[in-house]
Amino acid sequence: MAIAEWRQQLESGEVSARELTDHHLARIKAVDSSVHAFLEVTADRARADADRLDEARAAGEDLPPLAGVPIAIKDNLCTKGIRTTSSSRMLESFVPPYESTVTDRLWRSGAVLIGKTNLDEFAMGGSTETSAFGPTANPWNTGYVPGGSSGGSAAAVAAGECMASLGSDTGGSIRQPASFCGVVGLKPTYGRVSRYGLVAFASSLDQVGPFATSVSDAAELLQAIAGEDPRDSTCLKAPVPNYREVLGRSVSGLRIGVVRECFDQEGIDPQVKASVLAAAELLQSLGAELVDVSCPRFNDGIATYYVIAPSEASANLARYDGVKYGFRAEDASSLASMTARSRTEGFGSEVQRRILIGTYALSAGYVDAYYRKAQQVRTLIRRDFETAFASVDVLLTPTAPSTAFAAGAHADDPLAMYLADLLTIPANLAGLPAINVPCGFDSEGLPIGVQLIGNVLEEPLLLQVAHQYEQSADVMSRRPEGAFIPV
């Protein structure tokens, strides 16, 4: 059920907010032991919030736009009075005294918090296997990963445990799991959505965005969370347009740039390539013009990212020292010993790896060769995009080089794990909006996603193209039999 359809049923009294909430809580109870999308289910709060909305409707009050919509929140977004762990032992007992801007805006819009979702520890990973509280499974096949780092949020939507969810995207952490789980995932322009209350990973790259089962529902969530926030100095002051009203517009006459570098390289699954090119051809049949585009430094993004992101992470995570809050090692012999042991015992191996990489890249004698050089390449990547957008409206690529991989497949190969974000990272480095839309299935019945990238603040155009593709392709009507999630 789409959010707009649900709102009509709520307003007519056909279905109550409590009934919808109970339906999703029952779904969580039925399937989450297999999926493990949730770290915490806020059943009592969800029912209480739903009851208040039902009372407001019965009293004839105007209902907010997301009234009664059950939403899950990635557990690196602060929720006042509700544990926020970032899936790390370091923050296992942290209960925020304040609300993140995005969650506050959702609650003001009437959304119902149904729970907090699992993620790779501190959002560092591409499979949701580095969580200190156990991995999340892909609802399409529980022997496969859901992607990451927002795998819990993607899996919860895919498994029908909530109507929509929020995640964060630093190098693909919304779009890649959306592709693996067969849902829509949107990373907005950097600064379009406030980061206040998001546990920081890499501050120049992090952005919050929605997961949903449809483009229209993703637009509804973006409408609620976008906009200026004085508590985030990087948040843009640009007015928020009406994202809903663009969905019905045609793609006729738009120029879609097919990024050559994303298709002409080894490592792209032939089934993914064929499905994404078929998506491009469908857009062409709807009146769009396909244009062959080159972004020469697109594939340099991953090396650039794995200098910049760990460098920022090493600075951001320096605050966790066992003194003021977070995990503290017991029986330390000195302050230095307590700090060292707290960080060693509180952080998992992938987080430690990235801190070490970042600290090395920022160290005296190496900062010019690594960090400053990476920033220079980042500028060149931005310029490639600027050149491309001078001649096209939207860029089209696969979201990921492959479909979901088997659980544990990359456990001993960090590089293979990092390469899963090969095609999503450049949009983060350039601060551009990008969206994943399901476009097919591989021979194993696992979803494939197409990525659309827009220019700065061109979310309306992205949503327009994505919606028109989604409506014409009707991919989910072709999903294979035997999938875990026939909701």
UniProtKB/Swiss-Prot annotation:
GO terms for biological process: translation. The gene is gatA. GO terms for cellular component: glutamyl-tRNA(Gln) amidotransferase complex. It catalyses: L-glutamyl-tRNA(Gln) + L-glutamine + ATP + H2O = L-glutaminyl-tRNA(Gln) + L-glutamate + ADP + phosphate + H(+). Heterotrimer of A, B and C subunits. The active site is at K74 (charge relay system), S149 (charge relay system), S173 (acyl-ester intermediate). It is an enzyme of class 6 (ligase). Its EC number is 6.3.5.7. Allows the formation of correctly charged Gln-tRNA(Gln) through the transamidation of misacylated Glu-tRNA(Gln) in organisms which lack glutaminyl-tRNA synthetase. The reaction takes place in the presence of glutamine and ATP through an activated gamma-phospho-Glu-tRNA(Gln). Keywords: ATP-binding, Ligase, Nucleotide-binding, Protein biosynthesis. This is Glutamyl-tRNA(Gln) amidotransferase subunit A. InterPro entries: Amidase (IPR000120), Amidase_CS (IPR020556), Amidase_dom (IPR023631), AS_sf (IPR036928), GatA (IPR004412). The keyword Nucleotide-binding applies. Belongs to the amidase family. GatA subfamily. It comes from Synechococcus sp. (strain CC9311). GO terms for molecular function: ATP binding; glutaminyl-tRNA synthase (glutamine-hydrolyzing) activity.
